[in-house]
Amino acid sequence: GFEVIDNIKDSVVILGGPNWNVKMGDIRPLTGSNGEIRFDNNYFK
């Protein structure tokens, strides 16, 4: 499935496997154990 992040851009990072590009507000297919949504306010500081 897809997780669509658009309202809490400053605190959301979408992480996947080692080949994924990670951007705020991105849409990525999250499948298996390699897909994770992490809420971390300090990530971009």
Swiss-Prot record:
Which cystines does this chain contain?
none
Enzyme Commission designation: 1.11.1.7
Gene Ontology MF, one:
lactoperoxidase activity
Q: Which cofactor does it need?
A: heme b; Ca(2+)
The GO cellular component terms are: extracellular region
User: What does the entry's cofactor note say about binding and number?
Assistant: Binds 1 heme b (iron(II)-protoporphyrin IX) group per subunit. Binds 2 calcium ions per subunit.
* GO BP annotations listed: hydrogen peroxide catabolic process
The record's similarity note reads:
Belongs to the peroxidase family. Classical plant (class III) peroxidase subfamily.
Q: Would you tell me the protein name for this molecule?
A: Peroxidase 3
- Recite the UniProt keywords alphabetically: Calcium, Heme, Hydrogen peroxide, Iron, Metal-binding, Oxidoreductase, Peroxidase, Secreted
**Functional note:** Removal of H(2)O(2), oxidation of toxic reductants, biosynthesis and degradation of lignin, suberization, auxin catabolism, response to environmental stresses such as wounding, pathogen attack and oxidative stress. These functions might be dependent on each isozyme/isoform in each plant tissue.
What is catalysed by this protein? 2 a phenolic donor + H2O2 = 2 a phenolic radical donor + 2 H2O
Native organism is Capsicum annuum
What is the annotated localization of this protein? Secreted
> Which enzyme class, named as a word?
oxidoreductase
